[in-house]
Structure formats: C-alpha cells, structure tokens
Amino acid sequence: MKYLIFFLIIISGCAKDFSKNKIQTITNFQAAKVEGNHNVFISNEAFKLVNNITSEDCESWALDLNFDDPIKNSIKNLSDKMFNSYSISKKKLSPKEIENSNFVSQISYEGFSGVSNFKTQRNTGVYEISLKVKVKVENSSKNIVNEISSNMSWEKNIFFDCNLHEGGIYSGQKALDNLMRKVYESTYESIYNITR
C-alpha cells in the first residue's frame, strides 16, 4: 500500500497543469484623456485564432490560447482610461444616430483574429503569432478605418525544456500588449482627425 501511495504522489507531481498559464487582460494603460461623449462598440464575434502546428516537439499538443475575453476586456479598460465620458453599445449606430445622440464619435472594434505557426527548424522550435483587429472611428460625416496587427515570435531549443504552451503565452501576451498600444494610438489619432 505504501508503494501505491508513493507511486501516485510521484505521478501527480510529474503531471503538468497547462490551464494555469493564460493570456491576461491589459490593465496598465498610459492614455491621454479625450474630451466629449463617445460611443464604443465592441463586436461580440468570437476571436478567431488559427493554429498551424507542423511539429509535435515542445509539447505542442498542449497549446491552448484564448484571446477572446482578454482582448475585449483590454478594450474596455482602455476606454476607461481614455474617455471622460463614453457608452458601450450592443450595436453600431448609424451616422444619423451618432449625431442625434450627441456623440463626438463612435469607435467600433471588430474583426478580431489571429494566426499562430509552430515548426521545428533543425533543433529549434519556432513559434510566431499575429493578432489583428479592425478599428473604425466615425462621426456623422467622416470615418476612418484602420486594420491593426501585432506580430511576435518565440524560439527554444527542443532538447532544453521546450514547452510551446509557455512560449505561446509569453509571445501571445507580448503581442496583445503591442496590439493594444497600437489600438490606442490609432484610436486617439483617428478621433483627432475626424473632430478637428
């Protein structure tokens, strides 16, 4: 009986739990405040991440990245930091509705997608991730649409504790940080351009 308990303890100690590491919402924005009342629309479409895994090295079977809640919650956090007054709507408003509601602008975030690739080159696992979002800033008479993307990569020797899930979390988090910085810059500049 002692050996059975000892064996179970050893087995459970060796099992990895990949569910603990996940992409986190961005909260630490440095953003200038934008005056006026704005409407923010965040599409409820699911974030589409296409994984192209061509190698079984680095425990690639365990790769499981979820960007849907982190990116949408990051946009909400950005809006809190960026706008003195704003509303989040469940649908896009028409230019006439924007004007009638006295919104300075409507900012729509949609087209959430990403592609990740993993392959082995010689003895190195190579992972690349690209995240994309479409940002449309409009008022009753003008609109500006920007397709924003962020790319990051990660490499590790396949013989030295190579774990794709950990590498994917690391590079995915950096890609999301970079994407949100670009989203802020694009949104701020577009609002300035349509309201001047």
What kind of feature is each model-predicted range?
Residues M82-K92:
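Short secondary-structure junctions
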Residues K16-K20, K91-S149, K156-F160:
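Surface-exposed short loop/turn segments
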Residues C14-A31, E138-R196:
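C-terminal/domain-edge helix-coil "capping" segments
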Residues N52-C58, N117-T120, F160-L164:
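Short acidic, glycine/proline-rich loop/turn micro-motifs
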Residues K72, K76-D80, N84, Y184, ...:
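Generic solvent-exposed, charged/amphipathic alpha-helical segments
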Residues Y3-S12:
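Sec-dependent N-terminal signal peptides
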Residues D64, D68, K72, V126, ...:
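Solvent-exposed, acidic/flexible segments
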Residues G13-L78, Y192-R196:
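A structural "domain/chain start" motif
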